Amino acid sequence: FFFQAEDGIRDYKVTGVQTCALPIFQGTGTEGRVTKKDIIAFVEAKKSGSAPIKTVGSTPSAAPSTSASPSVSLGGDVEIVEMDRMRKLIADHMVMSKQTSPHVTSYVEADVTNLVMWRDRVKKSFEKREGEKITFTPVFIEAVVKAIKDFPLINVSVDGTKIIIKKNINIGMAAALPTGNLIVPVIKNADQLNLLGLTKSVNDLATRARANKLQPDEIQGGTFTLTNVGSFGNVMGTPIINQPQVAILAVGAIRKKPAVIETPMGDAIAIRHMMFLSLSYDHRVVDGSLGGTFLRRVADYLEQFDENREI
């Protein structure tokens, strides 16, 4: 007897078994196909006189549901905690994003020594004058806004086969909540704010996000998102796109590292402040050339930051 095996083995010969002796039964292969192991098991069962293999009737069995989550073994010492409403929304949104957008992530390392020196110089006087602290986040956002102006096809969304180019630049900034959940307040028209305006917007939204005092419209309408994984001490990340946007930037921790720099006397090794930037983007509309060039441009703006700048 000959049969076509699911596992790619064709014309496998089982001696001593006639075609008419084989019942129709459910195989263990893909979609119930009969495999070589199934035939051998049938022959051995026939020889030993053990319980027959369960046959399949004329009515096909229902296909298993693909939407149900795989069962999880609850053996051992476990505690079951129901997701709260926000965690359920986040979970659904993350799964939907991965199913919608083919994600690609590019990385670049940036020398932000000038930026660190600038902040060290202005942070005390800024806090004394404004009554609030200045972080690196508004500078990151400023660099992103400049790069989006250079590459507007990053600031888009997708509707079927249509690319919707957004004229407003609304930057979402992912913020961790005391509960462990995540929220993304949005700085609307970030391109119309100077560095002082961005700093005040970042501080205001972050403070009210932690206090659960954001308005609904303040977490909607983003066109690009920034997430600071460096705040957890992480050096880089592979962020998931915040739908319906097509790109998200993760900024890593700033660390002192030895690096090669160019001097009038030639190359030299110096201690520099370095960080990684990682950009995840939707490969349906953002190719590696656009994504990589945009990311490099953001890094260039950070590296070229004027440490003598006033705010």
Question: Whereabouts are the PLM-identified features?
Answer:
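Single conserved hydrophobic/aromatic residue that forms the stacking wall/gate
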Residues: 1-20
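Short acidic, glycine/serine/threonine-rich helix-capping segments at coil-helix boundaries
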Residues: 23-33
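A short glycine-leucine-enriched loop at secondary-structure breakpoints
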Residues: 16-17, 28, 218
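C-terminal catalytic/motor cores of large multi-domain enzyme assemblies
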Residues: 33, 37-38, 42, 46-311
